Amino acid sequence: DTAIVLKQKVDAGEIVISENTHRLVEGIFDCQDLRVQSLKGITPPINAWRVRGERQTESRFDAQHGAGLTEFVGRGDEVELLLRRWERTKSGEGQVVLISGEPGIGKSRLTQHVRDRLANEPHTRLRYQCSPHHTNSALYPVVSQLSFGGGIAAEEAPSAKLDKLEALLTRGSADLQPISPLFADLLSIPYSGRYPALDLTPQVQKVRTLEALKDQLLGLASQQPVYMVFEDLHWID
């Protein structure tokens, strides 16, 4: 039957999904079409996909709208408010805006539209995606953003990951020696061949990591304005 045929196409522990499920998650997960041919008593051919892993995207919004967006309509007052705050940011006054409301009203779309409006202005863009599945993972949005911003893939060798991490950190810091081990440890990247081990208590390491993150952000902001968005803030750790 169908289950037996699909079992022959995948290895133990792999995940196979249907066509309907694939349509819902194709922007979030990397899937391979199994191309199962017609079987006796089964018409048309089976449409099934093997899930190969999670796609590296900046946010849930980007994953769900990778194919493109419709024209942005309305929200003129909100857009103008955010752009006025951006002008104040460029003059050196840091701004914080909370966008709240029921799911589906267009909060992420609003921030995306403002981001598009800033496309021709010099700035640094940071987007942090909080998740209900990682509320117990310390600094998950930061870890995810660093991995995405540095183009660090899970399957890469530790040396390649460190190279990309260092390239990312140079954007906000001149001295990488004291901070690279902290960031590498945060991203679970082995670094023993390049940096000495951190001889710190967990509490001290936590404090220094937070300080390094703050200094990195300040370093970026000293060069040009930073447009930073936290998605689904209520799920932050």
Where on the chain are the PLM-derived regions?
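Key residue(s) within conserved catalytic/signature motifs
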Residues: 1-237
